[in-house]
Amino acid sequence: MPTINIYKWRLLNELKISETQLEDLLFNLKSEMKPIDQDHIEIEINNDRPDLLFVYGIIRSIKGLLKKELGEPRYSVKDTDYVFEIKEVPSRPYALAAVVEDIKFDDELLKELIQFQEKLHITVGRKRKKIAIGLHDLKKIDSKHIIYTTVNLDYKFIPLNSDKEMSVREILESTPQGKEYGNISLLDGKMPAIMQDDGQILSLPPVINSEKTRINSKTQSLFIDVTGTSLDTVIFTLDVIVTNLAEMGGKIGRIKVISPYVDNSPLLQHKSIKITAEYINKILGTNLNKNEIIEYLKMARFDVNDLGKEIEVIIPPYRNDILSQIDITEEVAITYGYNNLSPTPYKIEKIGSLSDRTKLIRVLRDLSVGGGFTEIFTFTLISESLLLGDFVKILNPITVDYNSVRNSLLPSILIFLSKNQHARMPIRVFEIGDVVIRNENTETGYSNKLNAAYAIMNSRVSFEELQAPLHEILNSLGINPIYKRDTNPLFIEGRTASIYANNKKIGIIGEINPNILEKIDIEYPIVMSEIYLDEIKDIL
């Protein structure tokens, strides 16, 4: 987890608390501190709280715990004359900016601001690959029209910590920042650049700023730019920075943005989550009334609307860790106090045993191996191009080959078979594993289901070659299956059946459609079946 070094007296004086109290309060924020020297402490911050990577973010949260301030802070935001024009930058397409004025720095606070910038680079920014931040002295910018564009490698400016003009190529090849970050956004001999409308470069993201706009302890106004590959992350990062600076008295300035995605920035976006007192009390084992819960949520620095049966919680723009009702419940637990949650003695009156689910898996595994099948284990993630129906898609996949969560075991097994066509035929395999399917009755709208799947691949194979051993396996479980003709785009029409038991559908079986096989470059015919083990468990 990230750590920050801060001047402890700022915290203690602002909050008017002792060092021991500070340690206890930080623990409530899932953070820990240890002394560095007489004036400084190191604080370990939880990964999901980038808003606490700056001293004033910590002060904001602790003021809530101490009830010195309740609800979301109100920040002064005014429109400015600055314009930020976004050109096409293929390697790093998103950029936003803001102005913060009336800031008072000292040497310690300036160090902590630069530390905040670098910690955001490492955590949220994934070492500047996802986002990069530029901090500029606003008074040193000569124009109110700033442009985000690309420049070629011969373009020159004076980089930070230098007194001579250098070309972009020289900066990438000779400076420490250029060597470490230069290749991140270099594309076709061009680099992203933020410049004045007269062509003077202010920043070369994600590498280095210009010496022209260097900040120091006398800086009173900042121009902040954030560039990146994810618009949502760029928006959030800028919101986190400006709200932290506003906590130290800064006035946020809104900038007009010329871009295809936003008209101005910062956006300071809010979202809301509705929750009930019953839900919170059920999770925490408490008996808090609605008014008490509202008070605890305000201590967590949330605004709250009483909707009668429900409570609407307004999530501040700097809290991207609040995703669902369970996160709201955790915030109530923090402000209520974990030490105030009474543990309930749990009496175990019988010895442990295997669950029905585990027993079924073990028996089915033995029967399947006895039926001549080899067990395989495939990835839960798969390409969306191989899935049918409703499925969960990953927001930030590393690769398109694993951008979705499977809703069936069959596509995963087909991928396995496509990579093993060189093996000796026939190939008879099975897999027992979880799939994720649509379920409107759950909080997320999806739920896990346990399935088993079987496949036979050979130079010649038929429906009956799998039906016979599968029938024996199901019979051995105490299931008397009935097969009814059905259709499914994965299988050949007329060679497909749904499997029923006790008037409940428990699976499907069929010969794979040749068009599907051709799509994934399989040269052999395949017959497959998928069994819904949760349905079987209910029958047994």
Swiss-Prot record:
Its EC number is 6.1.1.20. Its cofactor is Mg(2+). CDD domains: PheRS_beta_core (cd00769). It holds the Pfam family tRNA_synthFbeta. GO terms for cellular component: phenylalanine-tRNA ligase complex. SMART domains: B3_4, B5. Keywords: Aminoacyl-tRNA synthetase, ATP-binding, Cytoplasm, Ligase, Magnesium, Metal-binding, Nucleotide-binding, Protein biosynthesis. It catalyses: tRNA(Phe) + L-phenylalanine + ATP = L-phenylalanyl-tRNA(Phe) + AMP + diphosphate + H(+). InterPro entries: aa-tRNA-synth_II/BPL/LPL (IPR045864), B3/B4_tRNA-bd (IPR005146), DNA-bd_dom_put_sf (IPR009061), Phe-tRNA-ligase_IIc_bsu (IPR045060), Phe-tRNA-synth_IIc_bsu_arc_euk (IPR004531), Phe-tRNA_synthase-like_B3/B4 (IPR020825), Phe_tRNA_ligase_beta2_arc (IPR022918), PheRS_beta_core (IPR041616). It is an enzyme of class 6 (ligase). Residues 268-343 form the B5 domain. One of its GO terms (biological process) is phenylalanyl-tRNA aminoacylation. It is found in: Cytoplasm. Tetramer of two alpha and two beta subunits. NCBIfam families: pheT_arch. This is Phenylalanine--tRNA ligase beta subunit. The gene is pheT.
